[in-house]
Swiss-Prot record:
Catalytic activity, reaction form: L-seryl-[protein] + ATP = O-phospho-L-seryl-[protein] + ADP + H(+); L-threonyl-[protein] + ATP = O-phospho-L-threonyl-[protein] + ADP + H(+)
Record's keyword terms, sorted: ATP-binding, Cell membrane, Kinase, Membrane, Nucleotide-binding, Plant defense, Serine/threonine-protein kinase, Stress response, Transferase
Organism (species): Arabidopsis thaliana (Mouse-ear cress)
Gene this chain is encoded by: PBL12
Keyword Cell membrane recorded: yes
Compartmental location: Cell membrane
UniProt-annotated catalytic positions: D218
Domain (Protein kinase) ranges: 88-368
The name this protein goes by in its record: Probable serine/threonine-protein kinase PBL12
Enzyme class name: transferase
Induction description: Induced in roots by exposure to air, abscisic acid (ABA) and salt treatment.
Family indicated by similarity: Belongs to the protein kinase superfamily. Ser/Thr protein kinase family.
Length: 424
């Protein structure tokens, strides 16, 4: 875990006049609803660097209690979470990721007075895993302040002794990973796959276009959650980073992420930009098109890396038909598949300056959806909306010289519990 220096400046000065503070007394056993924001046009989103001592739980709790947000985050006690999850019963377990196990639970006003009755997902930190207090705090700082229909909603959190827990809205269809790769599951229709791709793209575009940009850094199928209507929402912001501001072109950081999804220039140099997320999106789009995992050691050596094997075939119509998920049969429209494949090809460019922005990605996917809807309704009017041509977007970003730096502490993070080929 990173070591942080304690800052002397209080957060109070950042929010003077913007918040109505409540009494910040003892936290054990009692609810501490985090502050509501008053009308404050100069509101600045908090970052990890704004916390006076990120490594100290009590300092963090004190800073949070004086700071945000309009979303009314709830502080849960460990005893309340035991009630919600039936004592963290294995029968309630939904899955397990890099942060730790996730349980299904239910909350109502008997547990928390005034709270809406609803199912929830409770994610508890694995004290022996790869992640810890910093990732828990990052999750609160990002999802506690950012609100969008394509980001999973954070309801509250728990911080008692070494325990770190997060409480989210429950997503009935689970992760895209499970829906796409689980054995014996029904094949997802082409239209559903493109709907999910569009929703996830809108989530990334929202982060990248924020006044203070956010780089998600760990975009993959297991972090895309689906509601009952297959609306996609991004989850797990433990590895997210604030993007470069002003004249800065990138953020330099230790390489983190998941094998098979991180952009090559990020792995090579540790230079992080929004283009890393665009590359990761291209990997997921390729998985949606082919129905294959990004990395699979059970495949032939030539095909183990999906990107290396499939990308060269994305621009050849005859070869493209060979790599499209055979479970789709004739569901997909040839032209729509070609547009999606061309988009994936662009996102997976080795040079970041040739990748589209996420806003451009959204425009292409929206055109696919609109044309598909029109054809489904029997409206084949040639004067109607056409596919957006990704090749016509101008490369307005300045090219950057690639610097080959081998970071001695670089690490491509792998999930603590190997998920590949285990039937999940």
């Amino acid at each position: 875990m990173a070591v942080f220096k304690k800052k002397k400046t209080s957060l109070t000065s950042l929010f003077l006049g913007c918040y109505k503070a409540k009494n910040a007394s003892k936290y054990e056993g009692g609810e501490k609803a985090v502050m509501k924001i008053r009308t404050c046009p100069a509101f600045k989103r908090l970052s990890l660097s704004d916390i006076s001592d990120p490594s100290s739980p009590m300092s963090v709790m004190d800073d949070l209690s004086h700071s945000f947000t309009s979303q009314k985050l709830r502080l849960f006690t460990l005893s309340e979470l035991r009630v919600i999850t039936h004592n963290f019963s294995r029968s309630n377990m939904l899955g397990e990721g890099g942060f730790g196990p996730v349980y299904k639970g239910f909350i109502d006003d008997k547990v928390k007075p005034g709270i809406e009755a609803q199912p929830v997902a409770v994610k508890a930190l694995d004290l022996h895993g790869h992640q810890g207090h910093r990732e828990w705090l990052a999750e609160i700082l990002f999802l506690g302040q950012l609100s969008n229909k394509h980001l999973v909603k954070l309801i509250g959190f728990c911080c008692e002794e070494e325990q770190r827990v997060l409480v989210y809205e429950y997503m009935p269809r689970g992760s895209l990973e499970n829906q796409l790769f689980r054995r014996n599951s029904l094949a997802m229709a082409w239209g559903i796959r493109m709907k999910i791709a569009l929703g996830a793209a809108k989530g990334l575009a929202f982060l990248h276009e924020a006044e203070k940009p956010v780089i998600y850094r760990d975009f993959k199928t297991s972090n895309i959650l689906l509601d009952s209507d297959y609306n996609a929402k991004l989850s797990d912001f433990g590895l997210a980073k604030d993007g470069p501001e002003g004249e800065h072109t990138h953020v330099t950081t230790r390489v983190m992420g998941t094998q098979g999804y991180a952009a090559p220039e990020y792995i090579m140099t540790g230079h992080l930009t929004t283009m890393n997320d665009v590359y990761s999106f291209g990997v997921v789009l390729l998985e949606l098109i082919t129905g294959k995992r990004s990395m699979d050691n059970t495949r032939t050596r030539r095909e183990q890396s999906l990107v290396e094997w499939a990308r060269p075939m994305l621009r050849d119509q005859r070869k493209l038909e060979r790599i499209i998920d055979p479970r789709l049969a004739n569901q997909h429209k040839t032209e729509a598949a070609q547009v999606a494949a061309s988009l994936a090809y662009k996102c997976l460019s080795q040079h970041p300056k040739y990748r589209p922005t996420m806003c451009e990605v959204v425009k292409v996917l929206e055109s696919i959806q609109e044309v598909d809807i029109r054809k489904h309704d029997g409206n084949n009017n040639k004067e109607g909306k056409k596919f957006v041509d990704i090749n016509k977007f101008r490369h307005h970003r300045k090219g950057k010289r690639r610097v080959n730096i081998a970071y001695s502490d670089s690490l491509v993070y792998k999930e603590s519990k190997a998920k590949q080929n285990d039937g999940i």
